[in-house]
């Protein structure tokens, strides 16, 4: 079920505080590290770079206009795909 239209998009208050501070200090090129993967990307985030925590490291995410309305967690994968292991019988030949 999707979020009600009556409600505004969710964005953690501390993320908004960090963004407002970066804009006020004119630090638009610095990385803003956040843990809130469930926060929605808003219009005022365009052009900023966020470090989204994936459980181990901060993955840099540069926000552009195509990302508005999506969540930060979509751009920071938490699992690494290592591929399938090949069949040992085939490799012996």
From Swiss-Prot:
A GO CC term assigned to this protein in UniProt: cytoplasm
InterPro entries: Ribosomal_uS19, Ribosomal_uS19_bac-type, Ribosomal_uS19_CS, Ribosomal_uS19_SF
Cysteine-cysteine disulfides: none
MF GO annotations: rRNA binding; structural constituent of ribosome
GO biological process: ribosomal small subunit assembly; translation
Keywords: Ribonucleoprotein, Ribosomal protein, RNA-binding, rRNA-binding
HAMAP family for the chain: Ribosomal_uS19
Protein name: Small ribosomal subunit protein uS19
Species, as recorded: Ehrlichia ruminantium (strain Welgevonden)
């Amino acid at each position: 079920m999707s979020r009600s239209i009556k409600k505004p998009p969710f964005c953690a208050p501390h993320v908004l505080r960090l963004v407002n501070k970066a804009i006020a200090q004119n630090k638009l090129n610095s990385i803003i590290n956040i843990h809130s993967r469930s926060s929605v990307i808003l219009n005022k985030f365009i052009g900023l770079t966020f470090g989204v925590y994936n459980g181990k490291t901060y993955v840099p995410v540069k926000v552009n206009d195509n990302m508005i309305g999506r969540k930060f967690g979509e751009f920071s994968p938490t699992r690494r795909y290592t591929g399938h292991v090949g069949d040992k019988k085939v490799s012996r030949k």
